[in-house]
UniProtKB/Swiss-Prot annotation:
Gene3D superfamilies noted in UniProt: Photosystem II protein D1-like
Pfam families, A to Z: Photo_RC
Organism listed in the record: Fagopyrum esculentum subsp. ancestrale
UniProt miscellaneous comment: 2 of the reaction center chlorophylls (ChlD1 and ChlD2) are entirely coordinated by water.
Topology in the lipid bilayer: Multi-pass membrane protein
Name of the molecule in the record: Photosystem II D2 protein
Binding site for a plastoquinone: H215, F262
């Protein structure tokens, strides 16, 4: 017995096909399936930040003024973290803390969790957008893979670190001066600058900046002369499609400068991708370690000798004293709910004092 299987016909009005056709249609601003996550989350994250920095005080959570309404400027305004007593609560507007009261929700720090979570999902949506567009135009997904670096840093600093501590209170607040305070906090309480993961992150970011500058300058230096103008901007048409720089000339130049040079564009550009992304991932891993209060380098022998010998001091021991000073001065101001009091005689003094 023979059974003939015909082509299965789909309903012309299938909802998925209708949505897929509309979402992925060629338009000035691509939407895509990733846009269903990206655009709402980005809108709420940015809107929440503008709302918080404009109107919302941090008096109830940090004892601070943090909005334009209270006299702050762009550098000092912030959306502050919730109070330490709220631990890791999601602080939902309809949750047991705010009970649907929007004013109370803002006073408790609900905007911080709102901005942090919507911001994280917005960044993930942007990475998915790059995946989706790369697949549509048949590109490899390295743009999306590269963007995983900033996502890793954001998630580790704003979400994983406070999850390892006692609450969202110890995460960075969303503001310029607030981020600076958090950097000082990281140094004082974790000796972050001596952490090898931080060192790898700095090497990655600054190394990428150096590579960018060298690459841009080299391409400009080896452009073919295809015009009569006196300089780059007059001599070359910025809209031309063909490649007009010489990899061979660039290779010869850097071979003479360093003795070695990139032999092909694939390896060169992969290296420019690898350096910053690896640096960002390493720094993110380091922050995850700090969430667990892992220590990095402790040169105890130098600390013991400095304590015993007033004439012995190294840059390391001076930095350790500086960290103790940061902790002593910052903890009392930063955690007023703990009622910490440090008498003058216990504040750290270097051997030179």
């Amino acid at each position: 017995m023979t059974i003939a299987l015909g082509k299965v016909t789909k309903d012309e009005n299938d909802l998925f096909d209708i949505m897929d056709d509309w979402l992925r249609r060629d338009r000035f601003v691509f939407v895509g399936w990733s846009g269903l996550l990206l655009f709402p989350c980005a809108y709420f994250a940015v809107g929440g930040w503008f709302t918080g920095t404009t109107f919302v005080t941090s008096w109830y959570t940090h004892g601070l003024a943090s909005s334009y309404l209270e006299g702050c400027n762009f550098l000092t305004a912030a959306v502050s973290t919730p109070a330490n007593s709220l631990a890791h609560s999601l602080l939902l507007l309809w949750g047991p803390e705010a009970q649907g009261d929007f004013t109370r929700w803002c006073q408790l720090g609900g905007l911080w969790t709102f901005v942090a979570l919507h911001g994280a999902f917005g960044l993930i949506g942007f990475m998915l957008r790059q995946f989706e567009l790369a697949r549509s135009v048949q590109l490899r997904p390295y743009n999306a893979i590269a963007f995983s670096g900033p996502i890793a840093v954001f998630v580790s600093v704003f979400l994983i670190y406070p999850l390892g501590q006692s609450g969202w209170f110890f995460a960075p607040s969303f503001g310029v001066a607030a981020i600076f305070r958090f950097i000082l906090f990281f140094q004082g309480f974790h000796n972050w600058t001596l952490n090898p993961f931080h060192m790898m992150g700095v090497a990655g970011v600054l190394g990428a900046a150096l590579l960018c500058a060298i690459h841009g300058a080299t391409v400009e230096n080896t452009l073919f002369e295809d015009g009569d103008g006196a300089n780059t901007f007059r001599a070359f048409n910025p809209t031309q499609a063909e490649e007009t720089y010489s990899m061979v000339t660039a290779n010869r130049f850097w071979s003479q400068i360093f003795g070695v040079a990139f032999s092909n564009k694939r390896w060169l550009h992969f290296f420019m991708l690898f350096v910053p992304v690896t640096g960002l991932w390493m720094s993110a891993l380091g922050v995850v370690g700090l969430a667990l209060n892992l220590r990095a380098y402790d040169f105890v022998s130098q600390e013991i000798r400095a304590a015993e010998d007033p004439e012995f001091e190294t840059f390391y021991t001076k930095n350790i004293l500086l960290n103790e000073g940061i902790r002593a001065w910052m903890a009392a101001q930063d955690q007023p709910h703990e009622n910490l009091i440090f008498p003058e005689e216990v504040l750290p003094r270097g051997n030179a004092l």
